[in-house]
Design a protein with these regions (language model features):
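N-terminal post-signal-peptidase region of extra-cytosolic proteins
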Residues: 57-74
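Residues immediately within or flanking Cys/His clusters that coordinate Zn2+
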Residues: 78, 126, 149
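Short, non-ligating residues that shape and space the ligands of small metal-coordination modules
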Residues: 90-91, 138-139, 161
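Cys/His-coordinated zinc-binding microdomains
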Residues: 85, 133, 156
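N-terminal secretory signal peptides and thylakoid transit peptides that target proteins
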Residues: 1-17
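Mid-length scaffold segments of soluble, non-membrane domains
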Residues: 74-103
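C-terminal segment of N-terminal export signals and the immediately downstream linker at the start
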Residues: 18-56, 64, 168, 172
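Short cysteine-rich clusters marking metal-coordination/redox-active sites
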Residues: 81, 129-132
Length: 172
């Protein structure tokens, strides 16, 4: 936990209720239809993702800053949930926040749900994949204009698909 994260954590106030505003379709990942919410227990995903990814996604662990190859990575493409493959972010919205975690100015509409996290004494707004419920990261109010948001994501919880490759089918 670095100083920047401590300070920005204080500025992060409630934004949205959990899993509000679904707009993605399960059968058409980038379209504007609600995703089908999966009801699998965390154990369902154990053999489908790495041990490190599982801890982040289903035990809400946080990867060490600077540890993800996706942090300093700016190729064109889409960032999918590492568990269920729902597209969560586009490369156009990725930027270098200097925090050591992959950061985005906005998610794909409806791909994420948020809730307050009081784990660190002050509230932070954490967000989850709207389809499988996997924990991805936290959103802060110190992002670049005009949106002003920093969606701070664990790289290990993402799967990158280059723009010139087809998206894999959703799984789960
Ligand atoms: Zn997911």
């Amino acid at each position: 936990m670095n100083r920047r994260t401590l300070l920005t954590g204080l500025a992060s106030l409630p934004v949205l209720p959990l899993f509000s505003g679904f707009t993605l379709a399960a059968d058409s990942p980038l379209s504007a239809q609600p995703p089908t919410r999966l009801a699998h227990p965390p154990s369902y995903w154990r053999d489908k993702v790495s041990a490190e990814a599982w801890k982040v996604l289903f035990e809400e662990a946080t990867e060490r800053p600077g540890s993800s190859p996706l942090d300093q990575f700016y190729e064109p493409g889409n960032y999918l949930c590492a568990a269920c493959y729902l597209p969560l972010f586009r490369s156009e919205d990725k930027y270098d926040s200097g925090t050591g975690w992959p950061s985005f100015t906005q998610p794909i509409e409806g791909a994420l749900g948020t809730k307050l996290d009081f784990r660190l004494l002050w509230p932070r707004t954490e967000y989850h994949c709207a389809r499988c419920g996997g924990h991805q990261g936290h959103v802060f109010n110190d992002g670049p204009a005009p949106l002003g948001k920093r969606w701070c994501n664990n790289g290990v919880a993402l799967r990158f698909v280059p723009a010139d490759q087809p998206l894999p089918p959703l799984r789960g």
